[in-house]
Swiss-Prot record:
Keywords: Bacterial flagellum, Bacterial flagellum biogenesis, Bacterial flagellum protein export, Cell membrane, Membrane, Protein transport, Transmembrane, Transmembrane helix, Transport
Biological process, per Gene Ontology: bacterial-type flagellum organization; protein secretion
Membrane-crossing residue ranges in chain numbering: 29-49, 51-71, 95-115, 175-195, 197-217, 219-239
Record-stated family: Belongs to the FliP/MopC/SpaP family.
Topological relation to the membrane, as annotated: Multi-pass membrane protein
Cellular component GO terms, alphabetical: bacterial-type flagellum basal body; plasma membrane
The organism of origin for this protein: Borreliella burgdorferi (strain ATCC 35210 / DSM 4680 / CIP 102532 / B31) (Borrelia burgdorferi)
Biological role stated in the UniProt entry: Plays a role in the flagellum-specific transport system.
Pfam families: FliP (PF00813)
The protein, known as: Flagellar biosynthetic protein FliP
Subcellular location: Cell membrane; Bacterial flagellum basal body
């Protein structure tokens, strides 16, 4: 858990190194009307800007972690399961998100461990500076994101490279990080929806069968969902659905 906490602070710590340079450059030559920065002092302004940027990064870091890890795919697939079973409130959203979080930690643990050993520990022992810390820390995440897209033709990377007016990269290292993140998010959405459709199919067939039987019996006013719900739950329990879904999600990242 300590490693996960250190990884959570990875984005905020790295931003501080860039904030120091940017804030010092910004305070030189500020000329706002009705404001006299000379009486305040450049160091105080720089510290205030650093604090503002640091708090902003800490606020946005959960969103970055959600989009750059396996949480995106896992959370969408688990939500598809609940909708396929026609269950609106069971299991509760908090439990679904908690399960997605712990599955994310399980699948991302090798990546988190690499960041901890290659970036955080050397920085803690003052063996590397902040720039080296950022490069060593982002490398395992880049490898993880690229590995998830290695099963296709890298259409997402080509799309965002062309939209950014970049030349075609010769290898993985030439892909900018912001392009890789955008491509990874799009790829995860596509994979999650494909998995969700496969989960939906057997339950849709069951709904169609129940609706056809009700129409044949003349029970048109009775909602088919009410009748098919118990059969969906029985089918899901008999095939050990949670184990199949969990193992399938974990194997999809290997």
């Amino acid at each position: 858990m300590r490693k996960c906490f250190n990884f959570f602070l990875f984005f905020s710590v790295t931003s501080l190194s860039f904030a120091q340079t940017k804030s010092l450059q910004t305070t030189n030559g500020l000329n706002f009307p009705f404001l006299n920065f000379d009486s305040i002092g450049g160091s105080e302004i720089a510290f205030s800007l650093q604090l503002l940027i640091l708090l902003t990064i800490i606020t946005l870091s959960p969103a970055f972690l959600v989009l750059m890890t396996s949480f995106l795919r896992i959370s969408i697939v688990l939500d598809f399961i609940r909708r396929a079973l026609s269950l609106q409130q069971s299991p509760p959203t908090q439990i679904v998100m908690g399960l997605a979080l712990f599955l994310t930690i399980f699948t991302m643990w090798p990546t988190f461990n690499s960041i901890y050993e290659q970036a955080y520990l050397p920085l803690k022992e003052s063996k590397i500076n902040f720039n080296e810390f950022y490069n060593k820390g982002i490398a395992p995440l880049r490898i993880f994101m690229y590995k998830q897209m290695s099963d296709g033709r890298h259409e997402e990377i080509r799309l965002f490279m062309s939209m950014s007016n970049y030349d075609r990269p010769k290898n993985f290292s030439e892909v900018p990080t912001h392009v890789l993140i955008a491509a990874f998010i799009l790829h995860e959405l596509k994979v999650a929806f494909k998995m969700g459709i496969l989960i939906f199919l057997p339950f849709i067939v069951l709904d169609i069968i129940v609706a056809s039987v009700l129409m044949a019996m003349g029970m048109i006013m009775l909602p088919p969902v009410m009748i098919s719900l118990p059969f969906k739950l029985i089918l899901f329990v008999m095939v050990d659905g949670w184990t199949l879904i969990t193992s399938g999600l974990i194997k999809s990242f290997m």
